[in-house]
Amino acid sequence: MATQEEKQKALAAALGQIEKQFGKGSIMKLGDTKTLDVESISTGSLGLDVALGIGGLPMGRIVEIFGPESSGKTTLTLSVIAQAQKAGKTCAFIDAEHALDPIYAAKLGVDVKELFVSQPDNGEQALEICDALVRSGAIDVIIVDSVAALTPKAEIEGDMGDSHMGLQARLMSQALRKLTGQIKNANCLVVFINQIRMKIGVMFGNPETTTGGNALKFYSSVRLDIRRTGSVKDGENIIGNETRVKVVKNKLAAPFRQVDFQILYGEGISKAGELLELGVKHKLVEKSGAWYSYNGEKIGQGKANSMKWLNENIEKSDELEARLRAELVANPEQALMADIEQSENNTESESDFE
């Protein structure tokens, strides 16, 4: 029977052979790797960055964002592109739906002159383009909008009534098998936007499912469920949507956290509104009655006026965001405890009301 010393020598020889054949870093101890702190790209929503646990969407991984129509899926991905471009990243948008509006993208902060766009004719072409971009190693963020629009070539060339059972699911499964390793090696973030369908005949449980089969569910490191929960009004006018995002899968931090924020028409995610709410929750912004104060200075009466002050005072707004990000992203447990405490307070308030 081999002694411990002989086992260690055999292991060292095997590791040496593997590294010689496949390159240095092809095998290592989990604790030795310097890539435990995953690089991330901000989503443009501070609350969502905190809920994700790593400060944003992870580089070198596949992410799925799904939800009903007009829930904010494309807006969220355009916000990710805007944040990536600010960080000096190169981005590409594969527009399988042929519906990307450059004017709207520019309003959300996207530098449309620097954004690579492709409008493929079929699903195979879209995924081949995605594969080529990933393999180039020169693109940092790729958005595919959407999985439902990745129509297989056979379906496009066939007659309208032809049955193509499972064709799209097989296409996605094959593509993701090829892409996953390349995405990790290129340290590229690939975001798939997906739509929701209803499963027929489901009596119990959730009848909703996403298109393109189950492969994307397995290969995704992060899955975000985005929903519209209400309207944002200015008097009688509707100026945006109340939006809720739930992290339904997360391989890099605790899943199942959710966050609420506003998406304003023609503006995108309301940064000032989030800063106020998170600032009050974590005691960086003081609220006394209807008045909000920051660093001992009154900034406005009512939420709307305070948001206006933050939008006008960019330096103060950036300072508050930096303080919140340093406190919450570095200590996600603290953010979680604050959410639990607020939930308990809300429950007590409801009990008192009853």
From Swiss-Prot:
Cited SUPFAM superfamilies: P-loop containing nucleoside triphosphate hydrolases, RecA protein, C-terminal domain
GO biological process entries: DNA recombination; DNA repair; SOS response
Keyword Transcription regulation: no
PROSITE patterns in UniProt: RECA_1, RECA_2, RECA_3
Compartments, record wording: Cytoplasm
Residues at which ATP binds: 67-74
MF annotations from Gene Ontology: ATP binding; ATP hydrolysis activity; ATP-dependent DNA damage sensor activity; damaged DNA binding; single-stranded DNA binding
Keywords: ATP-binding, Cytoplasm, DNA damage, DNA recombination, DNA repair, DNA-binding, Nucleotide-binding, SOS response
UniProt cross-references to InterPro entries, sorted A to Z: AAA+_ATPase, DNA_recomb/repair_RecA, DNA_recomb/repair_RecA_CS, P-loop_NTPase, RecA-like_C, RecA-like_N, RecA_ATP-bd, RecA_C_sf
Main subcellular localisation: cytoplasm
Cellular component, GO, one term: cytoplasm
SMART domains, per the entry: AAA (SM00382)
Presence of keyword Lyase: no
NCBIfam families associated with the record: tigrfam_recA
HAMAP family: RecA
UniProt family annotation: Belongs to the RecA family.
Function: Can catalyze the hydrolysis of ATP in the presence of single-stranded DNA, the ATP-dependent uptake of single-stranded DNA by duplex DNA, and the ATP-dependent hybridization of homologous single-stranded DNAs. It interacts with LexA causing its activation and leading to its autocatalytic cleavage. Plays a central role in DNA metabolism, participating in general homologous recombination, recombinational (postreplication) DNA repair, and prophage induction.
Protein name: Protein RecA
Organism, scientific name: Haemophilus influenzae (strain ATCC 51907 / DSM 11121 / KW20 / Rd)
Lineage: Bacteria, Pseudomonadati, Pseudomonadota, Gammaproteobacteria, Pasteurellales
